[in-house]
């Protein structure tokens, strides 16, 4: 097959070979005929690159702004601290809004090329990170890409980054069920990759967030992705002065607990809206060693996650 046109819908799309962008493409007859479609060669490359990565965990959210990237960072920090003999990687596939370089304190770092591929940026002795944020000329640069180009970038991150031996790779995704999700699932749901991908879904207590979380759960079920559980973020506000908690987002329909019962998925736990966490996210500081209600709740969530892998 020759190189696809710029706005190619992708060889696995139901519209492959049928949309206007396909007109004149030398591969149109192949893509439009289901009997002639070829397996994406990227799948074999991804399987080879991830052969030493034991577990893959998608961090998902149906709604934007629920703190999915923050939860990804907190999970990574706590797991790395509590399991110093294990190695963890973070892959930021929120192509248009990469947050992990800021959250993990790696803004301004550069990705280096070696004989075995891109070297992810080291965060701690047992944590590394890859993000498109490291490839931009400025943190303010906008990424204006259509689906096929995002798909190509994700394939590169999965197949051309030298992840080495990892016990867990956490993938921070954009909200919704968009091109990025379909791409990463198509590459990770592969019989050649052991211990295939699982998912954690992040929400807040109010119904406007839970509506989209239900869609995300159904997406996982349709794609055959096991759901480790749901994390309810910003479940309450913890005052930094008196330590008392109050509801910011009222759970008028029962919050994540009721939704998990309804959808038959586990509730991993709840995290409060803590000013210390907000400050740490802006500075890239690790505060998981502190003793407070937030880190205690985080510890319980991480224990349930690790138990699910065992």
Swiss-Prot record:
It comes from Drosophila willistoni (Fruit fly). One of its GO terms (cellular component) is cytosol. Its cofactor is [4Fe-4S] cluster. It is found in: Cytoplasm. CDD domains: Mrp_NBP35. [4Fe-4S] cluster 1 binds at residues 8, 22, 25, 31. GO terms for molecular function: 4 iron, 4 sulfur cluster binding; ATP binding; ATP-dependent FeS chaperone activity; iron-sulfur cluster binding; metal ion binding. Keywords: 4Fe-4S, ATP-binding, Cytoplasm, Iron, Iron-sulfur, Metal-binding, Nucleotide-binding. Component of the cytosolic iron-sulfur (Fe/S) protein assembly (CIA) machinery. Required for maturation of extramitochondrial Fe-S proteins. The Nubp1-Nubp2 heterotetramer forms a Fe-S scaffold complex, mediating the de novo assembly of an Fe-S cluster and its transfer to target apoproteins. Binds 4 [4Fe-4S] clusters per heterotetramer. Contains two stable clusters in the N-termini of Nubp1 and two labile, bridging clusters between subunits of the Nubp1-Nubp2 heterotetramer. [4Fe-4S] cluster 2 binds at residues 239, 242. The keyword Phosphoprotein does not apply. Heterotetramer of 2 Nubp1 and 2 Nubp2 chains. GO terms for biological process: iron-sulfur cluster assembly. Belongs to the Mrp/NBP35 ATP-binding proteins family. NUBP1/NBP35 subfamily. The keyword Metal-binding applies. This is Cytosolic Fe-S cluster assembly factor Nubp1 homolog. The gene is Nubp1. ATP binds at residues 62-69.
């Amino acid at each position: 097959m020759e190189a696809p046109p710029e706005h190619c819908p992708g060889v696995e799309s139901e519209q492959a070979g049928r949309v206007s962008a396909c007109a004149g493409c030398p591969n149109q007859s192949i893509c439009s005929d289901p009997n002639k479609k070829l397996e994406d060669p990227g799948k074999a490359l991804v399987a080879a690159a991830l052969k030493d990565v034991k577990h893959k965990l998608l961090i998902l959210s149906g709604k934007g702004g629920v703190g999915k990237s923050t939860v990804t960072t907190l999970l990574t920090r706590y797991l790395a601290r509590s399991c110093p003999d294990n190695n963890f990687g973070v892959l930021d596939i929120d192509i248009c809004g990469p947050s992990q370089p800021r959250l993990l304190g790696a803004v301004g770092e550069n990705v280096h090329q070696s004989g075995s591929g891109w070297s992810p940026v080291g965060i701690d002795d047992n944590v590394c990170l890859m993000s498109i944020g490291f490839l931009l000329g400025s943190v303010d640069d906008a990424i204006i890409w259509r689906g096929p180009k995002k798909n190509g970038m994700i394939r590169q991150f999965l197949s051309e980054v030298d992840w080495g031996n990892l016990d867990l790779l956490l993938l921070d995704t954009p909200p919704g069920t968009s091109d990025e999700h379909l791409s990463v699932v198509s590459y990770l749901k592969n019989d050649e990759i052991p211990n295939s991908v699982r998912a954690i879904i992040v929400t807040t207590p109010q119904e406007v967030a839970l509506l989209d979380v239900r869609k995300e759960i159904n997406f996982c079920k349709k794609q055959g992705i096991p759901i480790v559980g749901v994390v309810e973020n910003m479940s309450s506000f913890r005052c930094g002065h008196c330590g008392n908690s109050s509801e910011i987002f009222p759970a008028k329909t029962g919050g994540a607990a009721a939704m998990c019962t309804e959808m038959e998925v586990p509730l991993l736990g709840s995290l409060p809206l803590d000013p210390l966490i907000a400050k740490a996210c802006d500075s890239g500081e690790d505060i998981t060693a502190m003793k407070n209600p937030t880190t205690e709740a985080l510890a319980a969530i991480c224990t349930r996650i690790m138990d699910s892998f065992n």
